[in-house]
């Protein structure tokens, strides 16, 4: 990868981090589901991923900026896994199953929503 590719990833990840921290800030301590900002960020990242996939982006630098940089830094898969681990450690198995299903299903549904919205209204 050339130096400009790293720069696209760096700039994209910077914006992804800023948006993620903004969502964390505005969500505060109010829990919408089991976990507030991690669920919100993962669902939004899935929606954005669906939208961008529907746009069929082929520009290599834009792919690095959006998919690798922005969405890679914006989404919180490692935080999701850490929360699942903590639920196992705390022996909260029912909450673990509900939270797992909630994140996976909502993320998948919002990916599909973003993809089909893009196909319907933009393409």
Swiss-Prot record:
The keyword Ribonucleoprotein does not apply. The chain crosses the membrane at residues 3-23, 38-58, 62-82, 94-114. It catalyses: fluoride(in) = fluoride(out). Na(+) is not transported, but it plays an essential structural role and its presence is essential for fluoride channel function. InterPro entries: FluC (IPR003691). It is a multi-pass membrane protein. Its main location: membrane. It is found in: Cell inner membrane. GO terms for molecular function: fluoride channel activity; metal ion binding. PANTHER family: FLUORIDE EXPORT PROTEIN 1-RELATED. Belongs to the fluoride channel Fluc/FEX (TC 1.A.43) family. This is Fluoride-specific ion channel FluC 2. It comes from Prochlorococcus marinus subsp. pastoris (strain CCMP1986 / NIES-2087 / MED4).
């Amino acid at each position: 990868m050339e130096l400009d590719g790293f720069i696209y990833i760096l700039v994209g990840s910077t914006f992804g981090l800023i948006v993620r921290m903004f969502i964390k800030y505005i969500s505060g301590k109010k829990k919408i589901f089991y976990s507030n900002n991690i669920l919100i960020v993962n669902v939004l990242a899935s929606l954005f991923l669906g939208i961008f996939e529907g746009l069929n982006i082929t520009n290599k630098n834009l792919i690095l900026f959006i998919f690798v940089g922005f969405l890679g830094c914006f989404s919180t898969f490692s935080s999701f896994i850490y929360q699942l681990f903590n639920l196992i450690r705390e022996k909260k198995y029912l909450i673990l199953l509900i939270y797992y299903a909630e994140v996976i299903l909502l993320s998948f549904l919002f990916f599909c929503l973003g993809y089909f919205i893009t196909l319907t209204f933009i393409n």
